[in-house]
Amino acid sequence: MFIDIHAHAYRKAFFQAPGRRPWPNADQLIEFYDKHEVEKAVLLPLIGPEFYLPQSNEDILEAAERFPGRFIPFCNIHPQAIYNDPFSKLEDVFKQYRDAGCKGVGEVICNMSFFDPFMTNLFRAIEEMQWPMTIHVAHRYGRCYGIYDEPGLPGLAETLQRFPGMKVFAHSQTFWAEIAVLDTPHERAGYPKGKVIEGAVPKLMRKYENLYGDLSAGSGCNALTRDEEYAVKFLNEFQDKLMFGIDICSAPGEPHHVSLMNFLKKLLAEGKISQTVFNKIAKENAIRLLGL
C-alpha cells in the first residue's frame, strides 16, 4: 500500500540521542513495515558533522542487499568531499554509487547556504546524474542541521531555477511551516498550528516543476492536519508532487509513526480524496520518480 520515501537505519541500533530512544536498524524497520503495509522504503544515509552520528553509504547498501526489494538505497557525500574544493567532480563518486544500485542523493543536511559554492557544486553534480535529491531545510546556522534558507525560501527557489534537471524532495519543519504565511520567522523552527493562508511552499510547487513534497516526519503531517480543509485542496492540487514518508528516528512503533498514514486513510474513507489521489501519494509518485 505504501512506499516510505524517507527512512533511516543504522547497522546496530545502539546509539541514543539525548531524550530519544535508540535509532532503528534495518530489521526493526522491516518488522514495522510488515505490520503497516509499507512495501518499500527509500533508505537515506546520514553523513557529516552536523548530525549526531554519521554513517557510511556502505551501511545503506548492505541493508538493501540483506532485504532485496524492500529498501531503495540513496547515497550521500558532503559537498567538501574529495579535495575540499568547490570544483571537485563529485559526480565521479556518484557514478560509482549509481553502479552499486543507488537511486538518488540524500538526506542532504549540510548546515550551509543554498548559495555556498560547495553546495552549488553538489547540485551541479546531482543534476548531471539526473538524480533526485532529498533535502532538509534549516532555519538557522549552528545548533541545527540542514541547508539554511531565509523566510520565503529564496535560496530554494533560486536553486530550483538554476538546476531545473535536479528533482528536489524537500522536507523539514522549516520547509513545511511555509505551507502558510508565517506569523513570525520563529515559526519555521517548529510545528505551527492554525488555519493556512497560502505561503511559499504551494507557490513554489506551482512555479517549479522540479520541486516535490516529502511528507515525512511530524512536519509534513502537521502541515496537513493543522487545517484539514486546506489539506484536501493541497493534496488534490499537488497529487503528482507529494510522497508519503515516515522518517523514523527511534525504535519503530511510536504513535506519530502512523499519524500520516492514518490521516490519509481517513480522508480516503470520507471521500475527501479519491483512490487515485491516495495511490499516487502513497506509492505511485515514488515509483514514477525513482523509476522503480
What are these regions (language model features)?
Residues 23-30, 53-63, 88-92, 152-157, ...:
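Alpha-helical scaffolding within the catalytic cores
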Residues 47-48, 77-79, 111, 139-141, ...:
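Active-site-proximal loop/turn and secondary-structure-junction residues that shape catalytic pockets
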Residues 104, 119-244:
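Catalytic pocket-lining loop regions of alpha/beta-barrel enzymes
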Residues 1-40, 239-243, 249-292:
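Mid-to-C-terminal alpha-helical segments outside catalytic/metal-binding sites
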